[in-house]
Structures are given as C-alpha cells and as structure tokens.
Amino acid sequence: MARLKEIYRKEIAPKLKEELKLANVMEVPRITKITLNMGLGEAIGDKKVIENAVADLEKITGQKVVVTHARKSIAGFKVREGWPIGVKVTLRRERMYEFLDRLLSISLPRVRDFRGLNAKSFDGRGNYSMGVKEQIIFPEIDYDKIDALRGLDITLTTTARNDDEGRALLRAFNFPFRN
C-alpha cells in the first residue's frame, strides 16, 4: 500500500472526521483522482512535439497517456478539427498516491523561487488545480534529453462538498500553501 494512503487511513481520516464534525468516516473527504494535462499549442507546426510530451508524461506518471484532439476548427489559432493539441493522463488509486507523494516530497521543493501553493485555486466544489511551469522538477525527467521546457496543469479531484473541506483535506496531507 502507498505510504500516503496508509497515512490517510490511519491519521488523516480520523482527524478530519473530528475537525469537520462528521458522523461517519465514509463522509470524510478524500482525493479520488489526479489529472495531469499538457496543452500543446506549438504542436500545430511540429508533430514531434506531441511524441516528446507523451514520453515525458509517461515517465512522470508511469501510465499510458491519452492524446487530446481539437473538437472544432478555429481559424484564428490555425487549428483544424481532429488535430492533436495536447496530452493528458488520469491517475487513480495506488498510482495517484505514489505520484502525490513524489510531488509533495521531491518535485515541489525543486521548483525555483517556490513560495508555496496558492490556497485560492479551488473551484468551489473542493477540487484543487495548480500549474507547473517546467517538467524538469520531476526526478524522472532527464534534463539533458528534453527538447523544450513545457508546463502542465495538475488537478486534484476530491469528494469534498466545498472549498473549506477540500482545503482541510489538502492541509492534512501537508500541502505547502502560502499563508
């Protein structure tokens, strides 16, 4: 079992049950999935960009990546319907907790000028989104083998009913929020 999952079950869930005054331990908010998305506008001119982004995300997550395609043509962006414009991957269960552990303990401390995560990046339903400016903060990526620095979006989907519950859950996981 993943280290963070064990900590959640034994320490975080009982603590949150008391803190949020919930009747049942099954009501305690939990993280259901983590979605990583890389929007690649530059892929329009060069198809190799998609292949490199797929390789990077597969190294980071250890899971097969899905290529996202344009839903409709937009002349202003020179995009045609069906063209590949991004890559995404959804992590659940064990892989999700393993990734979260690596993100919190290894990757975020490697971010340049890191002052903490924005505590206001919740969507109103307890889900948290954050952006990473460069993929080299992950230890799986070899700095010498990348062709370009690419950012990615990370979204944590929770069962929390509102932002306060979601914030309490992520604080219990020791997320480094700015004050």
UniProtKB/Swiss-Prot annotation:
Gene Ontology MF annotations: rRNA binding; structural constituent of ribosome; tRNA binding
An example Gene Ontology CC term for this record: ribosome
UniProt entry keywords in alphabetical sequence: Ribonucleoprotein, Ribosomal protein, RNA-binding, rRNA-binding, tRNA-binding
InterPro entries from the UniProt entry: Ribosomal_uL5 (IPR002132), Ribosomal_uL5_bac-type (IPR020930), Ribosomal_uL5_C (IPR031309), Ribosomal_uL5_CS (IPR020929), Ribosomal_uL5_dom_sf (IPR022803), Ribosomal_uL5_N (IPR031310)
Gene Ontology biological process terms from the UniProt entry: translation
Pfam family, one: Ribosomal_L5_C
Coiled coil: none
Cysteine-cysteine disulfides: none
Purpose: This is one of the proteins that bind and probably mediate the attachment of the 5S RNA into the large ribosomal subunit, where it forms part of the central protuberance. In the 70S ribosome it contacts protein S13 of the 30S subunit (bridge B1b), connecting the 2 subunits; this bridge is implicated in subunit movement. Contacts the P site tRNA; the 5S rRNA and some of its associated proteins might help stabilize positioning of ribosome-bound tRNAs.
Family listed: Belongs to the universal ribosomal protein uL5 family.
Quaternary assembly: Part of the 50S ribosomal subunit; part of the 5S rRNA/L5/L18/L25 subcomplex. Contacts the 5S rRNA and the P site tRNA. Forms a bridge to the 30S subunit in the 70S ribosome.
Protein name in the entry: Large ribosomal subunit protein uL5
